[in-house]
Design a protein with these regions (language model features):
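Extracytoplasmic small-molecule ligand-binding "clamshell" domains
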Residues: 28-100
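Sec-dependent N-terminal signal peptides of Gram-positive bacterial secreted proteins and lipoproteins
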Residues: 3-26
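Short beta-strand->loop
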Residues: 108-131, 185-188, 221-239
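Acidic, polar ligand-binding/catalytic clefts
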Residues: 82-151
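An extracytoplasmic/periplasmic, membrane-proximal ligand-sensing/linker region
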Residues: 31-56, 246-308
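Bilobed "Venus flytrap"/periplasmic-binding protein-like clamshell domains
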Residues: 40-63, 74, 115, 127-199
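Short beta-strand-to-loop elements that line the ligand-binding cleft
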Residues: 68-75, 90-93, 184-194, 232-235
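A ligand-binding cleft/hinge motif common to bilobed small-molecule-binding domains
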Residues: 96-107, 176-177, 201-203, 208-228
Length: 308
């Protein structure tokens, strides 16, 4: 009997230690406060040009947070997700699909959602109304004979990473809803880096079509002033939630609040607004929650079925 009591007592001690360890782990999992903040962007245009544009953001964040800040541009959508998952990056400017993936795989948390000016079709002229969504477009060269989604069968299309909402997921899902399967209808996809390259691939005749975000043609107006006449939209998708500012899942709530305030203050400043506007056409940031991205999850499921 004494032996049984000793065994039970030992088990209770072990159980207590396990419980304490688990409790401390949970606390540690939400208690990370960076001493040197790492911020990363995904490339929406030429990576070198974009890197030069975002570098000044580091100083503005340092002034707000009073810690060293490093700002970089990732090579693609997947690398930033993996970098946040492996805790090499603290803050990511994640497009909606990349956020959904990062949240599912690594518990990444969304803090803010971007606001942009809306666009009027057909020439993508910006309105004065701020919105928290955007749309994807499928564009072709004018006079190509491609007038609708069915005409894309057998054609060559410039696309972005498969985690890109406007550069892949939403256009592919919408094509599927209209009976065009990107894997089975003899369509050739060409992955390019940045929406400026996607637009120019159509403009120069290197591809028949491109998946872009609405307004992306404006990125190349300086080099191709007649782009609106030569590259036209044949399809515009439903609304896509705007880009996020997201953080690694173990970041402390207190530091999350500091970041929210810092980014909102920067967006309101002259220098800060110039940076975010030139990089992603962001005009400001509003608080966001995970359920805001359920539409993205719906379209992700459609694309996943296509790939099965």
């Amino acid at each position: 009997m004494k032996r049984i009591k000793k065994v039970l007592l030992s088990l209770l001690v072990i159980l207590g230690l396990v419980t304490l360890t688990a409790a401390s782990s949970v606390h540690a999992d939400s208690d990370y406060t960076p001493k040197h903040l790492t911020v990363e962007f995904v490339p929406s245009s030429n990576a070198q040009k974009m890197s030069a544009r975002v570098k000044p953001l580091a100083k503005l964040l340092e002034q707000q947070l009073h810690i060293p800040v490093t700002v970089t541009v990732s090579t693609n959508y997947n690398t930033i997700v993996e970098a946040m998952g492996s805790k090499k990056v603290d803050v990511g400017f994640l497009p909606p699909d990349a956020y959904v993936q990062a949240h599912k795989q690594y518990g990444v948390k969304v803090l803010l959602q971007a606001q942009r000016f809306g666009y009027k079709e057909p020439d993508d002229q910006p309105t004065n109304q701020l919105v928290n969504y955007y749309r994807a477009q499928i564009v072709v060269r004018k006079g190509s004979g491609i007038k609708n989604l069915k005409d894309l069968k057998g054609k060559k299309i410039a696309v972005q990473d498969t985690t890109s909402s406007s550069g892949w997921v939403f256009p592919v899902a919408c094509m599927e809803e209209h009976g065009i399967n990107i894997n089975k209808d003899h369509i050739q996809t060409v992955q390019v880096k940045g929406y400026d390259q996607a637009v120019m691939s159509v403009y120069n005749g290197n591809t028949d079509a491109a998946f872009i975000f609405q307004g992306a043609r404006n990125l190349v107006k300086k080099d191709a002033p007649d782009v609106m006449k030569k590259v036209v939209s044949i399809y515009t998708t439903p609304k896509i939630p705007n880009d996020t500012i997201s953080v690694r899942g173990d970041m402390s709530p207190a530091f999350q609040k500091k970041l929210i305030k810092a980014f909102q203050n920067i967006a309101k400043s002259k220098k800060g607004h110039a940076i975010i506007s030139s990089v992603y056409q962001h005009e400001g940031y509003v608080p966001a929650k995970d359920s805001d991205f359920n539409t993205v999850r719906k379209y992700d499921k459609i694309v996943q079925k296509i790939n099965q």
